[in-house]
Amino acid sequence: SRAVADSWMDEVIKLCGRELVRAQIAICGMSTWSKRSLSQEDAPQTPRPVAEIVPSFINKDTETIIIMLEFIANLPPELKAALSERQPSLPEPQQYVPALKDSNLSFEEFKKLIRNRQSEAADSNPSELKYLGLDTHSQKKRQPYVALFEKCCLIGCTKRSLANYC
């Protein structure tokens, strides 16, 4: 059965888009099961502690979520509103109109004040993507996947090469 699994994994496929993603999911599911069955043949079945049953990625995801929640809790209110409502982090100039009517500022001074605040906010606040951890680090992590997916689509790749990314 092991030789059949090896020949199946060395089979070359040429898929693109959704079909490639479906194949990746199927291969990852099958390679996980085959790894489990091979390890069960080699080692006797012993009960594992509950902590080992929970996959490590869940613990890492939990840590990441906690860090993000703490970070978001410390954000200025304007940025919290931008993250939750997907609105610009700065108020629109129309919201300043009542304040302008009650003040002695000229319209030109008022426009200058708004521009200064917008440029200060742009300089001091990183983009929304950085707050969510989706900056260049995540893009670099995706680059090998993109290269492999392009190869699988244009030339073809083995199921084993897809299984390496499970």
UniProtKB/Swiss-Prot annotation:
Disulfide bonds join 16-153, 28-166, 152-157. Pfam families: Insulin (PF00049). GO terms for molecular function: hormone activity. Keywords: Cleavage on pair of basic residues, Disulfide bond, Hormone, Secreted, Signal. One of its GO terms (cellular component) is extracellular region. Residues 1-5 form the signal peptide. The keyword Membrane does not apply. Expressed in the corpus luteum of pregnancy but not in the placenta. It is found in: Secreted. It comes from the Eukaryota. Residues 37-139 form a propeptide. Belongs to the insulin family. Relaxin is an ovarian hormone that acts with estrogen to produce dilatation of the birth canal in many mammals. May be involved in remodeling of connective tissues during pregnancy, promoting growth of pubic ligaments and ripening of the cervix. Heterodimer of a B chain and an A chain linked by two disulfide bonds. This is Prorelaxin H1. It comes from Pan troglodytes (Chimpanzee).
